[in-house]
Amino acid sequence: MTRKILAVLLVFTLVACNNAEKYSETDVEDSPMIQERRCEPSGKPCRPLMRIPCCGSCVRGKCA
């Protein structure tokens, strides 16, 4: 009886770990914090509070 309970617990643990590993991989792929940040290179026109900021700073309407 004890062996059956231990076997069921072992199988349940393995299945739970496998599912957790699978879902953690998809979370990393979909996470916006992990994605590479985009920025405008120097010389591109800019303005304060742009959706995609300059890689450096915005000086006189151009990325520096």
From Swiss-Prot:
Cellular localisation: Secreted
UniProt entry keywords in alphabetical sequence: Disulfide bond, Ion channel impairing toxin, Knottin, Secreted, Signal, Toxin
Prosegment location in residue numbers: 21-38
Chief localisation class: secreted
Signal peptide (from-to): 1-20
Single annotated GO MF: toxin activity
Source organism, top-level taxon: Eukaryota
Cellular component aspect of the GO annotation: extracellular region
Disulfide linkage: C39-C55, C46-C58, C54-C63
Tissue-specificity statement: Expressed by the venom gland.
Free-text note regarding domains: The presence of a 'disulfide through disulfide knot' structurally defines this protein as a knottin.
Similarity remark: Belongs to the neurotoxin 36 family. 02 subfamily.
Function of the protein: Probable ion channel inhibitor.
Protein name as it appears in the record: U6-theraphotoxin-Cg1a
